[in-house]
A protein has these predicted regions:
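Bacterial N-terminal signal peptides
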Residues: 11-20
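Sec-dependent signal peptide cleavage junction
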Residues: 21-37
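Short, surface-exposed binding/anchoring microloops in extracellular/periplasmic proteins
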Residues: 37-77
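Solvent-exposed serine/threonine-rich low-complexity stretches and specific carbohydrate-binding patches
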Residues: 84-100
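Surface-exposed, short loops/turns at beta-strand junctions within beta-sandwich domains
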Residues: 102, 109-117
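Hydrophobic/tyrosine-rich beta-strand signature of extracellular beta-sandwich/beta-rich modules
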Residues: 120-122
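Short beta-strand elements
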Residues: 128-145
């Protein structure tokens, strides 16, 4: 019994030390980040102020590589456990923006008069000569009181 307890203690100590080394290596190189073929960065913000919801979207690609971006965005409201689209007058309640340049930004606004939890759902599809299309999904929640 003493031998198995000692063995278990040593095994746990080795596992913990190895996992700590792996985490140290990741933090030493500045963390882990994804690499995209045609897209450098995106920025999405969503706020509601004075009964107006505002979704701000921007992206930056790579000069000489990025050729086109399609950005789809919508606002959804949470009811109990489910999310439902807020009517913005567009097909499928989705704003669709096309860009034929390396970077772009757009802001959409919508009247929101009911209090509750809302979110902006944004999908960036960025095309270019760097490889397969980059598809980035971002969700930003906001509680309107």
């Amino acid at each position: 019994m003493k031998l198995s307890r000692k063995f278990l203690f040593v095994a746990v100590a080795v596992i913990l030390s190895v996992s700590t080394l792996a985490m140290t290596a990741v933090y030493a190189i500045g963390g882990v980040s994804t690499c995209n073929n045609n897209l450098n960065m995106t920025a999405t913000s969503f706020v509601i102020f004075d009964d107006v919801g505002e979704v701000s979207i921007s992206f930056v690609g790579y000069t000489g590589i990025t050729t086109e971006a399609i950005v789809e965005s919508k606002i959804q409201k949470k009811t109990l456990f489910w999310w439902s689209d807020v009517d913005n007058g567009e097909t499928d309640n989705t704003w669709v923006d096309h860009f034929y340049k390396v970077s772009g930004d757009v802001t959409h606004t919508l009247e929101i008069t009911k209090k509750g939890t809302y979110r902006a759902v944004v999908t960036y599809t960025v095309k270019g000569t760097g490889g397969a299309d980059d598809v980035i999904d971002e969700v930003v929640e906001f509680v309107y009181k």
